[in-house]
From Swiss-Prot:
Recorded name of the encoding gene: rlmL
Organism from which the protein derives: Dichelobacter nodosus (strain VCS1703A)
Keyword match DNA-binding: no
Name of this chain's protein: Ribosomal RNA large subunit methyltransferase K/L
Xref: Gene3D superfamilies: 3.30.2130.30, RNA methyltransferase domain (HRMD) like, Vaccinia Virus protein VP39
Ranges of residues in domain THUMP: 47-158
Compartments (UniProt record): Cytoplasm
Keyword Nucleus: no
Stated family: Belongs to the methyltransferase superfamily. RlmKL family.
Length: 729
């Protein structure tokens, strides 16, 4: 006699519907329809068991008990009460209701679940004179209710919870990939067909190993849910243990045979984080696959092509949605594409990513694209074949941009041309200035609102935050144009390009380091000086390029003088004064981070101990002593917080107190160089009356800042008697 068929609903991730339909039909489901995130059909109890054990892509397996039109909360109650719950739930069982949807008087899902719970309890109390208890966390029976428009579907959740919880992954990384999505990726890329013959599989960004382990299970004919300990049918009144055990035994037999054949396969998972590698190894051990799957800490950039003639690459690299800024991931995607092109012709690759611009950075020709969702994140699964990659593409990508066929826009080509012209003009000036740290571009084209600074063999791109009126997608595309063009025009490795977003700073954020320090340090030169710069961890690099002329002026005038540097930052001005022969220098700043950096700059230039670093609030320090100086350089921030003194410094408001304090420390015949970069700054007339003041800003703008002459302003200030005597001479 034929087994009776029941209506089934198989929820899944959006984008997985067709894969799940094919899988369900192979397991015995008679498919009726597919819709976004769900497959519906008919199935026998045996097929339901097989779905629970063998479906790699379904989120849940639901057996429908009722599907009715409703128009009110009371109608929902009546539909639920008319179900013969006594045939499904024993009086001693616990149950819970999961409700999705709104409408028909249901304003929140808790109320919808309560109406169904009341109907179940009322029915059982009337029929069997007892009511079951509710257990929201680990119920024996889990009911699933879905309300869409006026249609209510009420079902038993035979899976007892999401089927991505296979039971083997108890440790994972920061952004784990669901096992069901991993299986979808593998099906989309036809891994289940590829692995019909022995092969090698590699995940170069494996995290806790989900993709590798799902691929190994697929190759071994290993039922994905064989490790699960909890099901939603074990206490169900219609459960048939003998039939279920038969399904389990069959799966165990297939698994044993499949694992025996795995010795002809090789599975590798790599990640630069040793913590997640340890988690991946533990997950493999729970599956009994530790002898066949090899996890090791390794950077993507360090991978070789020595993995055999035939194989498959799978990757779920960071998307840039939550794990980091998109621009920081460009080297990762570029390295992935470059490495894949070093593999033999019979290799294939499947990548899931959410950002099309990042995928383009791999410079690969896609075989097929598939839409997918990783949780709420819209993504793409892209299938590549090594044999379909033009052999000439890599060479073209490395040629000059003007000859390269890299698919950039006409506007991006104009930006590249401008950059080329700037470099040809600026580099000779930099050589004459004896420096390898200089600016080559600063918003020359309004569409590309960035500044580009060279630091030896590296580049820092500073993106000016676009106004809210600019379409964010257009702004991002222009940024990608910049990030694509710069390394090619300058012939740099993309890992030597650093991006920072410059926006209006607040007192609390202007000096904040990056969330995760990378410590990308370089040594640059400026005349006789050597400076340490950090290109990755702070908004500024430790060297203000626009003040190069001021540092040169201090070097030229410092011989035999006592020099004071206020708000000294990393004390690069003090270093130049010391190299220029200053009798001694004193550098004052409140930041221990920058004073440590300053000490490293002094050490780098082999300067003696007579050059003093002082941690102090500048305003308080000026009024706490009487020592005199022949030359003072004061370059305050526009504003800053001073926790210890419980005040906020504002350069416009506090300029008189600051300059008066400096002049009290300035010896007769001395010079104060006062500078700031606040564009709205106005020097108080009282200061001009009190001292001899001369603005010298025009003389402090060097070759690489001629396009932006208002980047800072500088005044030469002397005691009036000294200034008048100087003028007479």
């Amino acid at each position: 006699m034929d087994e009776p068929l029941f209506s089934c609903v198989l929820p899944c991730a959006k984008g997985s519907e067709q894969v799940l339909q094919q899988e369900a039909e192979q397991l015995g489901v008679q498919t009726l329809s597919i819709a976004p995130a769900v497959v519906r059909g008919k199935a026998s109890l045996l097929t339901f068991y097989r779905l629970c054990l063998w479906s790699r892509t379904a989120s849940r397996v639901l057996l429908v008990l009722a599907h009715e039109n409703v128009d009110s909360a009371e109608a929902i109650y009546e539909v639920a009460r008319n179900i013969a719950w006594e045939d499904h739930i024993a009086p001693d069982d616990t149950f819970a209701v999961r409700f999705n949807g709104l409408g028909c008087g249901i304003r929140n899902t808790q109320f919808g679940a309560l109406k169904i719970k009341d109907a179940v309890v009322d029915r059982l109390r009337d029929i069997v004179k007892r009511r079951p208890d509710v257990d929201a966390k680990t119920p024996d029976i889990l009911l699933d209710a879905h309300l869409h428009k006026n249609e209510l579907t009420l079902a038993l959740d035979l899976s007892g919870g999401s089927l991505h919880e296979r039971g083997y992954r108890q440790a994972h990384g920061a952004a784990p990939m669901k096992e069901t999505l991993a299986a979808t990726l593998l099906y989309r890329a036809r891994w289940h067909e590829f692995c019909a013959q022995p092969a090698t599989l590699i995940d170069p960004t494996c995290g806790a190993g989900t993709l590798v382990l799902e691929a190994a299970m697929m190759a071994a004919d290993y039922a994905p849910n064989l490790q699960r300990q909890h099901w939603g049918f074990t206490r169900w009144q219609n459960h048939r243990p003998a039939l279920w055990n038969k399904v389990i035994d069959e799966a165990q037999t297939r698994k044993n045979a499949g694992i025996a054949a795995l010795s002809d396969y090789v599975f590798y998972g790599y990640d630069q984080n040793p913590v997640v590698i340890a988690a991946a190894r533990a997950n493999a051990k729970r599956l009994g696959l530790e002898d066949f799957v090899h996890f090791a800490p390794k950077r993507l950039e360090d991978l070789t092509a020595d993995f055999g003639a035939r194989g498959f690459v799978v990757a779920n690299p960071p998307y840039g949605e939550r794990l980091g800024e998109v621009q920081e991931l460009i080297p990762t995607y570029a390295a992935l594409g470059h490495w894949f092109k070093t593999l033999p012709a019979d290799w294939e690759m499947a990548v899931i990513a959410s950002n099309d611009a990042l995928l383009k950075r791999m410079r690969l020709r896609a075989h097929k694209y598939y839409q997918a969702f990783n949780g709420t994140i819209a993504a793409q699964i892209v299938h590549y074949r090594r044999s379909e990659q033009p052999e000439s593409q890599e060479t073209a990508a490395q040629q000059k941009l003007a000859q390269a066929s890299v698919g950039i826009s006409e506007q991006a080509q104009m930006f590249a041309n401008r950059l080329q012209k700037n470099i040809q003009k600026i580099r000779p000036s930099a050589e004459r200035a004896q420096t390898d740290a200089y600016r080559i571009y600063d918003q020359d084209m309004p569409e590309y609102a960035v500044a580009i600074d060279c630091y030896g063999d590296a580049v820092v791109i500073q993106e000016y935050a676009p106004p809210k009126t600019i379409d964010p997608q257009k702004a991002q595309q222009r940024l990608f144009d910049v990030l694509q063009v710069v390394p090619e025009v300058l012939a740099l490795d993309e890992r030597s390009v650093f991006l920072k977003t410059r926006q209006r700073q607040t007192g609390k954020t202007q000096y904040n380091p990056a969330a995760e320090k990378r410590n990308e340090e370089r040594i640059v030169y400026e005349g006789a000086a050597r400076f340490l710069v950090n290109l990755s961890d702070y908004l500024d690099t430790g060297l203000f390029l626009d003040h190069r002329p001021m540092r040169r002026l201090l070097f030229e005038q410092a011989a035999g003088k006592r020099v004071l540097n206020l708000f000294c930052y990393t004390a690069t001005a003090s270093v130049q004064a010391a190299l220029g022969g200053a009798s001694y220098t004193t550098s004052v700043d409140l930041s221990p981070t920058y004073l440590d950096w300053a000490q490293r700059n002094f050490d780098l230039n082999a300067l003696s101990d007579r050059h003093r670093l002082q941690r102090a609030d500048v305003m308080a320090w000026l009024h706490s002593g009487k020592s005199q100086f022949d030359m003072i350089f004061c370059d305050p921030p526009t504003f800053s917080n001073t926790k210890k003194e419980q005040r906020v410094f504002d350069v416009q408001r506090d300029q008189i107190a600051l300059i008066d304090g400096c002049m009290q420390r300035l010896a007769a015949g001395g010079i104060l160089y006062f500078s700031n970069n606040y564009r709205g700054f106005r020097l108080e007339e009282a200061l001009c009356a009190r001292y001899c003041v001369q603005e010298i800003s025009e003389n402090t703008i060097d070759f690489d800042f001629k396009r932006r002459p208002k980047i800072h302003r500088v005044w030469k200030i002397m005691h009036r008697s000294d200034g008048e005597q100087s003028a007479e001479k």
